């Protein structure tokens, strides 16, 4: 397989984990922000997580630097544009990017400005490149809950014009879904689709709860359903797609190593699995790299890959028109 040339779809990619290191330097200069170095290799080393982190929380420390310079409309628009540009150049045909609007208010932007800026950057890239995209709004679970509905309201203005879904992200505690039932319902009532980070850090029950309590149609990661029979069967029965991120899952110790990742078993058992980057910079990866890793480690043929691509199309939060156009790339 020519991994670079193959058409690709990425349904699980974080904006603040996919910023170009040089852009962090540029934005810091423009905004007069002190950063540890103006050497791109030094900055990259602060943004890329080690191949093996002790846990997810250690991995998440790599986001502080890019977020510090993503506090203006121009910065958000640029970072969004560049992510879509980078993806388009490796034949990603459709990209869903998630980000937490709550993280970008340090210089006084409101949620409409924050969301509008990233959508604008995406639309600029769509006009220049053969790529389509949408945004997912991630609620950061470690932050106060009092402005969650405000985020949902602000995003509703952009629903189906660049924003499509609601997500919960950040470190994963057992039983977290119970606290977010009213917020997920509020988002659903507004017309959002739902995908939830769950089952990344060893808690299969969280996947069960995300589907049964929050209405999740997709699950971010979900790998620990392999030790929770009820969650596994619910994922199958409800045809819930799993957003697998192989490199990231090894880095965060969600799995011990790539050989122990359940992706191949899930695929062969008929679960709806997809291949995604998670964080292009923090995991120092691309869709090309993730596809090659998955193909080689899980013994996927080109036909297998086309089947996974179709699963990604069918479970994308895209319009029917966009889905039809995406299927033409493998016709």
Curated annotation (Swiss-Prot):
Cystines in this chain:
none
Per UniProt, where does substrate bind? 14, 16
The Gene Ontology biological process terms listed for this entry are: adenosine catabolic process; hypoxanthine salvage; inosine biosynthetic process; nucleotide metabolic process; purine ribonucleoside monophosphate biosynthetic process
Q: What residues does Zn(2+) bind to? A: 12, 14, 197, 278
- Which Gene Ontology cellular component terms are annotated? cytosol
Report the Gene3D superfamilies cross-referenced here. Metal-dependent hydrolases (3.20.20.140)
Q: Which reaction does it catalyse?
A: adenosine + H2O + H(+) = inosine + NH4(+); 2'-deoxyadenosine + H2O + H(+) = 2'-deoxyinosine + NH4(+)
Q: Which CDD domains match?
A: ADA
Q: What is its EC number?
A: 3.5.4.4
List the keywords (alphabetical): Hydrolase, Metal-binding, Nucleotide metabolism, Zinc
Q: Which cofactor does it need?
A: Zn(2+)
Catalytic site: 200
Q: Which NCBIfam families match?
A: aden_deam (TIGR01430)
Q: What is the role of the protein in this entry?
A: Catalyzes the hydrolytic deamination of adenosine and 2-deoxyadenosine.
Name of the protein in its database record = Adenosine deaminase
